[in-house]
Amino acid sequence: MLADLTVKDFLDKVACSDPVPGGGSIAALDGALASALSTMVARLTVGKKGYEASEEVMQHAQTITLRLLDEIIALIDKDSAAYNEVFACFKLPKTTDEEKTARSAAIQEATKQAALVPLEVARKALDMMSVIADVARLGNRNAVTDACVAMMSARSAVLGALLNVRINLGSLKDRDFVLQLQTEADAIEQTACQREKELLDAVNQDLRV
């Protein structure tokens, strides 16, 4: 399991010549880092003097970010597995017409799954961004820049994951499926970039001296 590796071992694995783990798994890792960091900010707020009014929001934020953390960690490996399945389908026999038909169908189905996994990463990272915005707004002011880094990591997760969605859509024949995912991907990207901009603009303005 990729998620069980040390940071050094994971990075060494990414840096090798194998195509997995690649950008999709890294996008999921970005999302996991965003979740972990936003959880830290919430925990630095709970129980602190002056933040009593934020207690309930921070407790709820922790519940959501920890759930998303577990879900996105699972997607780190799931993305690599989806790629491996597509690769395996290309190795299927293609001597007879029947084999060619079966191979083509298998490739199409595996490619759909390879598009759906990063889409799920993008969805979860986008969900996280709304929580991060609350954590940044109401959380410990000494950790507001940590919340911003969490937001940027979540945005990176979204954009990286959506690139992997789009590259897989390019080889699919099911145009209804392609249009559906393209439409959702475009909407997610627009919302993610807007959420990041709103937070960074506000925090950078506050930090100016």
Residue ranges and their predicted role:
Residues 2-21:
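Short, hydrophobic/aliphatic alpha-helical segments
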Residues 16-37, 143-161:
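Conserved phosphate/anionic-ligand binding catalytic regions in large, soluble enzymes, centered on
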Residues 48-58, 97, 144, 172-179:
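Short, surface-exposed loop/turn segments at secondary-structure junctions
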Residues 49-87, 188, 195:
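A structural-propensity feature for long, helix-poor, extended segments
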Residues 79, 83-152, 156:
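Amphipathic alpha-helical interface segments
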Residues 128-131, 143-202, 209:
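Preference for long, well-ordered alpha-helical segments
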